[in-house]
A protein has these predicted regions:
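Extracytoplasmic/periplasmic proteins that interact with beta-lactams or build/remodel peptidoglycan
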Residues: 1-71, 91-94, 100, 264-274
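Beta-lactam-recognizing serine transpeptidase/beta-lactamase-like catalytic domain environment
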Residues: 20-33, 76-114, 120-278
Length: 278
């Protein structure tokens, strides 16, 4: 509502008239009346039942895992309509002295997305026709990135043949680094990330959206693609991950995430964000 306050708020009417020195209107004097204007009605996509359930689930999750905060969003991948969205701490509308609770962190705060980025990585190479889900690669136990190396949490100390499907199912960090560096290649990887509009604002109709911090290809060093492949060396708001996942489920088409679906009784058309993958 704050985002749309300008159109929700009407304007007061006023009367301007000619008066004498004492403020008494002059009979037959000049006068001008401006009628009050009502605000514009809007319709939002929020489903109150889903919203309440989302708030309950995230509050329980944060308490269970003793997290600093948590966020959740439910949206339609084909339209971008948002049915539920919240971040902790949840706002207490009976006491809004702490306005920070009104912040939607999944829009306004950046973080390292981690393993969820692997969906983007595998999608980039698949879209380029470099592999199928069943293509097999020999993945080392440790994959060297600069002066460091990455390995999986399973304690594996030997190279293993993995299909791309297996890599994603088992969330293998060395496998993703290998795909980005040696199969896709850093330049094509950077181009694919850009096509997903990672590091660009989504255009969501909520105040405070940040673009995050994403290196361009010119800023890559020898480790950037490998780390980004599994969601490190990049900081973006959660809404960008949501939009990217939605594109994968929407035949590669990016949508604009939004709450507003109608204004003054007329449907609002939101622009497409372009084609991330085919």
């Amino acid at each position: 509502e704050y985002y749309y306050n300008d159109i929700l708020t009407g304007t007061d009417g006023q009367m301007i008239m000619e008066t004498g020195l004492g403020g008494t209107p002059i009979a037959g004097g000049t006068s001008e009346v401006t009628e009050a204007q009502d605000g514009t009605d809007i319709m939002l996509s929020i489903d109150i039942d889903l919203q309440e359930e989302a708030e309950r689930i995230i509050a329980e999750g944060v308490e269970t895992y003793q997290s600093e905060s948590g966020s959740v969003m439910v949206s339609d991948p084909k339209t971008g309509e948002i049915y539920a969205a919240c971040s902790t701490p949840l706002p207490d509308f009976s006491n809004l002295t702490d306005s920070s609770s009104l912040d939607l962190k999944l829009v306004s705060q950046s973080y390292e997305p981690g393993s969820v980025f692997k969906v983007i990585t595998t999608s980039i190479g698949y879209d380029l026709g470099l592999y199928t889900p069943d293509t097999v690669y020999n993945v080392p136990a440790r994959y060297t990135l600069g002066d460091n190396y990455v390995q999986d949490d399973d304690g594996r100390d030997y190279a293993e043949d993995m299909t791309v499907r297996y890599m994603l199912q088992h969330s293998s960090n060395p496998a993703m680094a290998l795909l980005a560096n040696e199969v896709i290649g850093p330049k094509r990887f950077a181009e694919g990330v850009e096509k997903f509009c990672i590091g660009q604002k989504t255009g969501i109709d909520f105040p405070g959206e940040t673009a995050g911090i994403v290196k361009s290809y010119d800023e890559y060093d020898g480790t950037t693609a490998g780390y980004m492949a599994f969601g490190q060396s990049v900081a973006i708001p959660m809404i960008q991950i949501i939009r990217a996942f939605a594109a994968v489920g929407n035949q590669g088409t990016l949508t604009t995430p939004h709450f507003l679906i109608a204004k003054a009784g007329e449907k609002v058309d939101w622009p497409s964000g372009g084609q991330a993958i085919s």
